[in-house]
Design a protein with these regions (language model features):
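Positively charged, low-complexity nucleic-acid-binding target-recognition regions
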Residues: 3, 285-286, 290-396
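Gly/serine-rich nucleotide phosphate-binding loop at the start of the catalytic core
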Residues: 1-76
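Stable alpha-helical structural segments in soluble proteins, enriched in small hydrophobic residues
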Residues: 34, 79-90, 358-368
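Short acidic-glycine loop/turn motifs at beta-strand connectors
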Residues: 124, 159-160, 196-199, 325, ...
Length: 396
């Protein structure tokens, strides 16, 4: 069984939008009340409470406050679950010695989703029925693909001025036919990916492409008066640009991952610590724009659902070592290390000559096969010496 998230666009009327926003506002107030309740109990009596203890307060709150009564009971219980998860994450970070980040109160407009964990929703032919204010509300939806499988949860999310519904469904595994091919991937900034067979995936640079337009919209927004009509219009333009960048990046990452999963049975990637790499102020913006972490997460998810294997290896020295003979320029006895500006690999020992990123991708593939698939051949992706061989063009 596999769990998927199916996302659809909702088109609520003005009245339905008001009801959704009122529900979000009520859930925000309940969330803040639960956080304050935990803090108050600990400060006064040194007592730690769990989500089940706090959920027992909801029946009384429903009697005292009509706004709380209008919210479905399953949605209220999910609010308590979110508070509990926030505190659990806080204590986990404290125990690990990380910066803890105490759970904060949600400001107005900062609570953007509600979840029906078990009941309170129904999917129609072109509508989604949600239980709000004590009765079902039929909201028009664009169901661009059928909801196949067992629906476990339903989440309604506000994204700017748009509304979406997300269904978590369980489906039977649909594995792709077995594929013997193996490939190594080297993430970069000049090219988004370099493959061990000599192919490249261009870096689209979505943020860089719209950076000037984004800066112009930001300057225009700062010149408007707060809480004015002009400020709301400027915010709308700014959010649309960010949404466009996000959607383009999301589409590119998913399509690239899907093509790789369809072609290869074993995919070797680098285990990059992107958070530390962002400390380089010269490359931080480009690294963030490349979205390597998102790509690896999507690739792993698609590989699992297709019965493919993704192997992450330590990227240390993969760009320095020669993929043909293993020669490493350690800086001693004239062995000059390659700089970041050196984009071509030439080995003084075996005379191997190839692109620097392709050389790294071959080393990544060899590390993955040596550690996890001993005795497995490279199936035409690389030769026995580890040098790239010709392969069909990989176009995206």
């Amino acid at each position: 069984m596999q769990t998927l998230c199916l996302r659809y666009r909702l088109f609520p009327t003005k009245e339905q939008t008001r009801k959704l926003e009122d529900t979000l506002e009520t859930c925000r107030l309940v969330y803040n009340s639960l956080v304050n309740d935990r803090v108050f109990r600990y400060e006064t009596a040194k007592v730690s409470v769990g989500r089940y203890d706090q959920q027992k307060m909801f029946p009384q709150w429903s009697k005292d406050f009509p706004e709380v009564k209008a919210v479905h009971s399953q949605v209220l219980q999910n609010v308590a679950v979110r508070v509990d998860l926030a505190f659990r994450a806080f204590f986990r970070r404290v125990k690990a010695g990380e910066t803890p980040g105490f759970p904060r109160l949600k400001g107005k407009g900062q609570y953007d989703s509600i979840t029906y964990p078990q009941s309170g929703f129904k999917v129609g032919a072109s509508t989604v029925s949600l239980s709000m204010f004590g009765k079902p509300v039929q909201i028009k939806a664009k169901l661009h693909r059928p909801v196949v499988g067992t629906v476990k949860t339903c989440t309604v999310r506000r994204d700017g001025r748009k509304w979406f519904v997300c269904f978590s469904v369980e489906q039977e595994d649909e594995f792709l036919p077995p594929c013997p091919g193996a490939i190594g991937l080297d993430a970069g900034l000049n090219s988004f990916l370099a493959l061990s067979n000599g192919e490249f995936v261009d870096n689209p640079r979505f943020f860089r492409r719209d950076e000037k337009e984004l800066a112009k919209a930001g300057r225009k927004q700062t010149k408007t008066k707060k809480r004015s009509k002009e400020r709301r219009k400027a915010n709308k333009v700014l959010s649309r640009i960010h949404e466009r960048i996000r959607n383009r990046r999301h589409d590119f990452v998913h399509q690239t991952a899907r093509r790789l999963v369809n072609r290869f049975g074993v995919i070797a990637v680098e285990k990059l610590n992107v958070k530390n790499m962002l400390g380089n102020y010269c490359l931080a913006k480009s690294i963030s724009d490349a979205s390597w972490s998102m790509f690896r997460c999507v690739l792993t998810s698609k590989a699992e659902s297709a019965d493919r294997e993704v192997i992450a290896v330590n990227p240390a020295y993969t760009s320095q070592d020669c993929s043909g003979c293993g020669y490493r320029p350690d800086g001693l006895e004239g062995r000059t290390k390659k700089k970041l500006s050196d984009r071509w690999h030439f080995c003084p020992k075996c005379s191997a000559s190839l692109d620097r990123d392709t050389n790294a991708a071959v080393n990544i593939l060899r590390l993955a096969l040596n550690h996890s698939l001993r005795g497995t051949s490279l199936d035409g992706i690389t030769s026995s010496q580890g040098k790239p061989v010709e392969a069909p063009a990989f176009r995206i």
